[in-house]
């Protein structure tokens, strides 16, 4: 049985988010194919996540023990490390993703939990895990220098040791003349297909 962490980062309501229409379809199909797996949904806008402050640094760099697992910040890092698979759903905002997702990544980027420092440099601790990034974008950003969200996520997940990463991108949703409903449906089809083997 696998533990799946479904991270959602969009301030829009469920029915309004084009990203969530695709990611929720992915999750539903995954459940059908993996009924024994545990799926934990983490809607970042419903969590008490903020930008790190000076007082938080002691928690991040302090002792990692049983008591620290209940820490208001470190609990997210432990939860992240405990998962086997990750579904990260976030739209492209200003060539990246919503700032709350970066704030969350700062919460889970903790030495001794998701990576460690060695004499040879940092080493990821989350090996043999997999992730999928589901993103909706207003324009066409495949292989574009303006695309920094998916590129960053792949880099930081790789830093944690996660190498098996897929991306489902629904592009050109804000381009005049594009059939948005059709584009989203294409994204859902891709999501369902990938969920069967994730």
UniProtKB/Swiss-Prot annotation:
Domain of life: Bacteria
Cofactor: how and how many bound: Binds 1 FMN per subunit.
Gene3D superfamilies, A to Z: 3.40.50.360
Hydrolase recorded as keyword: no
Keyword set includes Oxidoreductase: yes
Signal peptide interval: none
GO MF annotation: an example: electron transfer activity
UniProt keyword terms in alphabetical order: Flavoprotein, FMN, NAD, Oxidoreductase
Binding site for FMN: 136-139
Reactions it catalyzes: 2 a quinone + NADH + H(+) = 2 a 1,4-benzosemiquinone + NAD(+); N,N-dimethyl-1,4-phenylenediamine + anthranilate + 2 NAD(+) = 2-(4-dimethylaminophenyl)diazenylbenzoate + 2 NADH + 2 H(+)
Cofactor(s) the protein requires to work: FMN
Enzyme Commission number(s) of this protein: 1.6.5.-, 1.7.1.17
Quaternary structure and interacting proteins, as annotated: Homodimer.
Record-stated family: Belongs to the azoreductase type 1 family.
PANTHER family: FMN-DEPENDENT NADH-AZOREDUCTASE 1, FMN-DEPENDENT NADH:QUINONE OXIDOREDUCTASE
HAMAP family: Azoreductase_type1
Function as written in the Swiss-Prot or TrEMBL entry: Quinone reductase that provides resistance to thiol-specific stress caused by electrophilic quinones.
Protein name: FMN-dependent NADH:quinone oxidoreductase 2
Organism field: Clostridium perfringens (strain 13 / Type A)
């Amino acid at each position: 049985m696998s533990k799946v962490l479904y991270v959602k980062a969009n301030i829009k309501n469920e029915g309004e988010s084009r990203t969530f229409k695709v990611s929720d379809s992915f999750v539903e199909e995954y459940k059908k194919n993996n009924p024994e797996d545990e799926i934990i949904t983490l809607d970042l806008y419903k969590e008490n996540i903020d930008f790190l402050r000076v007082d938080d640094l002691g928690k991040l760099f302090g002792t990692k023990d049983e008591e620290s697992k209940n820490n208001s910040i470190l609990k997210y890092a432990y939860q992240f490390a405990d998962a086997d698979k990750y579904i990260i759903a976030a739209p492209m905002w200003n060539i990246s993703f919503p700032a709350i997702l970066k704030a969350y990544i700062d919460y889970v980027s903790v030495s001794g939990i998701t990576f460690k420092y060695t004499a040879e440099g940092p080493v990821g601790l989350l090996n043999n895990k997999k992730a999928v990034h589901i993103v909706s974008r207003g324009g066409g950003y495949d292989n574009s220098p303006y695309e920094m969200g998916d590129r960053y996520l792949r880099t930081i997940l790789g830093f944690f040791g996660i190498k098996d990463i897929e991306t489902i991108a629904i592009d050109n949703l804000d381009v005049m003349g594009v059939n948005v409903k059709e584009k989203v449906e294409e994204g859902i089809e891709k999501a369902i297909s990938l969920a069967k083997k994730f």
